[in-house]
Amino acid sequence: MVVKVYGQIKAANPQRVLLCFLEKDIEFEVIHVDLDKLEQKKPQHLLRQPFGQVPAIEDGYLKLFESRAIARYYATKYADQGTDLLGKTLEGRAIVDQWVEVENNYFYAVALPLVMNVVFKPKSGKPCDVALVEELKVKFDKVLDVYENRLATNRYLGGDEFTLADLSHMPGMRYIMNETSLSGLVTSRENLNRWWNEISARPAWKKLMELAAY
């Protein structure tokens, strides 16, 4: 059965789900939700995602929202199909879950307002909060130090294999690397830069970038 993904293919959170599907060889159909027109706030979409965000999915009777929960569900449901994204042991899965939580609570929590201020506000003609950006850059620098230390002794965030721990970071990292002037925060860190170069060369990621037509 083809999974329906409601969202905008260029948006970070839907990309997290789509990348999981591409790694797991899961068939999907993207139902475009135009964020610029605030279609995510309309009653029809609120039935799928009551907080007015994207993505949301429909898979037969199953309806889910929240990208990390969706990715974890499908990585578990199709554990033996495509790339193993969960970790091979109970302890390994706990470490993967830990870094998915780190991505949400520390990485994305800083990266999102950074990107909103340096990318999206200027595009919409709104002023960038320069003071906030400088404050966030200091916070982000400290967050990335933790990643640099982790990746000094591990090929990937979850250990020796590519998992959801790495996948969850990729949409946000793309904005930092490709659409802001902040890429130096990554390229100046040897281990973090090596990690990004490796994971962004994966076929599933390249396919997603083609679908998004960057």
From Swiss-Prot:
Glutathione binds at residues 11-12, 40-41, 53-54, 66-67. GO terms for biological process: response to oxidative stress; toxin catabolic process. Pfam families: GST_C, GST_N. The lineage of its organism: Eukaryota, Viridiplantae, Streptophyta, Embryophyta, Tracheophyta. It is found in: Cytoplasm, Cytosol. It comes from Arabidopsis thaliana (Mouse-ear cress). It catalyses: RX + glutathione = an S-substituted glutathione + a halide anion + H(+). The keyword tRNA-binding does not apply. Its main location: cytoplasm. This is Glutathione S-transferase F11.
